[in-house]
Amino acid sequence: MSVFIDKNTKVMVQGITGSTALFHTKQMLDYGTKIVAGVTPGKGGQVVEGVPVFNTVEEAKNETGATVSVIYVPAPFAADSILEAADADLDMVICITEHIPVLDMVKVKRYLQGRKTRLVGPNCPGVITADECKIGIMPGYIHKKGHVGVVSRSGTLTYEAVHQLTEEGIGQTTAVGIGGDPVNGTNFIDVLKAFNEDDETKAVVMIGEIGGTAEEEAAEWIKANMTKPVVGFIGGQTAPPGKRMGHAGAIISGGKGTAEEKIKTLNSCGVKTAATPSEIGSTLIEAAKEAGIYEALLTVNK
């Protein structure tokens, strides 16, 4: 089992003829992802990297049976691409694009309410189910199949955590990058619920950062519902108030959203937190040993 995607997921790439999309399409195909279609308006009928290109998402879905799309479309047009995917009733749309205007995303979020399409992102690295399906921009080779779920607001910290786990012989089920923007689709609790219900996932790494209250809300949900150990890390511990740290959503405002507050809440809800990024792997091992599941997590031959 895994969450959201697996080896049978049929994927379309929106904006496939752009240079960034082409590069990552090849990487995803090399990983074994079933990319069955691309979409670029006005370029239907072309074939790139062996993938047929269509003018619309609807046409691509009807012709190929794709159920998930990944968006590599420039920021001014990305919101419309998400809406088009939702109108086609895709199961999930993963938006990699950064710098989408906040008001665009507010409209998108409102539009998606009550619809079946799940949005992951924007401004995220994507979703990967180890050794099965990679949708996004993450380095595939560091991910190995196992029993730890990863959910994160940060792309590069996800890679750091996954690499540490793999080096320790601990594989992963699925890693989900939910993105660093203030208005996004899938949140921590959505992914934690999925991991909690997934038989293969035995423990979870959750990586947050300053800004907003998503981590605090997730911590309360974990305390009330989670049946598996969760370890956390919060980025931005040295950030001064009012200074945006990389992501649009990573800003402390009105005294809220500090790393200190988030860490305190996580710890009070039973989530062990790593003090630095380099300790994420060892913190998970510590929690796994306490839960008596450490041996079960050792799935990677070192």
UniProtKB/Swiss-Prot annotation:
<keyword id="KW-0816">Tricarboxylic acid cycle</keyword>
<dbReference type="GO" id="GO:0000166">
    <property type="term" value="F:nucleotide binding"/>
</dbReference>
<dbReference type="InterPro" id="IPR016102">
    <property type="entry name" value="Succinyl-CoA_synth-like"/>
</dbReference>
<comment type="pathway">
    <text>Carbohydrate metabolism; tricarboxylic acid cycle; succinate from succinyl-CoA (ligase route): step 1/1.</text>
</comment>
<dbReference type="GO" id="GO:0004775">
    <property type="term" value="F:succinate-CoA ligase (ADP-forming) activity"/>
</dbReference>
<feature type="active site" description="Tele-phosphohistidine intermediate">
    <location>
        <position position="247"/>
    </location>
</feature>
<comment type="subunit">
    <text>Heterotetramer of two alpha and two beta subunits.</text>
</comment>
<protein>
    <recommendedName>
        <fullName>Succinate--CoA ligase [ADP-forming] subunit alpha</fullName>
        <ecNumber>6.2.1.5</ecNumber>
    </recommendedName>
</protein>
<dbReference type="InterPro" id="IPR017440">
    <property type="entry name" value="Cit_synth/succinyl-CoA_lig_AS"/>
</dbReference>
<dbReference type="InterPro" id="IPR036291">
    <property type="entry name" value="NAD(P)-bd_dom_sf"/>
</dbReference>
<dbReference type="GO" id="GO:0009361">
    <property type="term" value="C:succinate-CoA ligase complex (ADP-forming)"/>
</dbReference>
<comment type="similarity">
    <text>Belongs to the succinate/malate CoA ligase alpha subunit family.</text>
</comment>
<feature type="binding site">
    <location>
        <begin position="96"/>
        <end position="98"/>
    </location>
    <ligand>
        <name>CoA</name>
    </ligand>
</feature>
<dbReference type="InterPro" id="IPR033847">
    <property type="entry name" value="Citrt_syn/SCS-alpha_CS"/>
</dbReference>
<feature type="binding site">
    <location>
        <begin position="17"/>
        <end position="20"/>
    </location>
    <ligand>
        <name>CoA</name>
    </ligand>
</feature>
<dbReference type="GO" id="GO:0005829">
    <property type="term" value="C:cytosol"/>
</dbReference>
<dbReference type="Pfam" id="PF02629">
    <property type="entry name" value="CoA_binding"/>
</dbReference>
<dbReference type="GO" id="GO:0006099">
    <property type="term" value="P:tricarboxylic acid cycle"/>
</dbReference>
<comment type="function">
    <text>Succinyl-CoA synthetase functions in the citric acid cycle (TCA), coupling the hydrolysis of succinyl-CoA to the synthesis of either ATP or GTP and thus represents the only step of substrate-level phosphorylation in the TCA. The alpha subunit of the enzyme binds the substrates coenzyme A and phosphate, while succinate binding and nucleotide specificity is provided by the beta subunit.</text>
</comment>
<keyword id="KW-0547">Nucleotide-binding</keyword>
<dbReference type="InterPro" id="IPR005810">
    <property type="entry name" value="CoA_lig_alpha"/>
</dbReference>
<dbReference type="GO" id="GO:0004776">
    <property type="term" value="F:succinate-CoA ligase (GDP-forming) activity"/>
</dbReference>
<keyword id="KW-0436">Ligase</keyword>
<dbReference type="InterPro" id="IPR003781">
    <property type="entry name" value="CoA-bd"/>
</dbReference>
<dbReference type="InterPro" id="IPR005811">
    <property type="entry name" value="SUCC_ACL_C"/>
</dbReference>
<dbReference type="Pfam" id="PF00549">
    <property type="entry name" value="Ligase_CoA"/>
</dbReference>
<feature type="binding site">
    <location>
        <position position="43"/>
    </location>
    <ligand>
        <name>CoA</name>
    </ligand>
</feature>
<feature type="binding site">
    <location>
        <position position="159"/>
    </location>
    <ligand>
        <name>substrate</name>
    </ligand>
</feature>
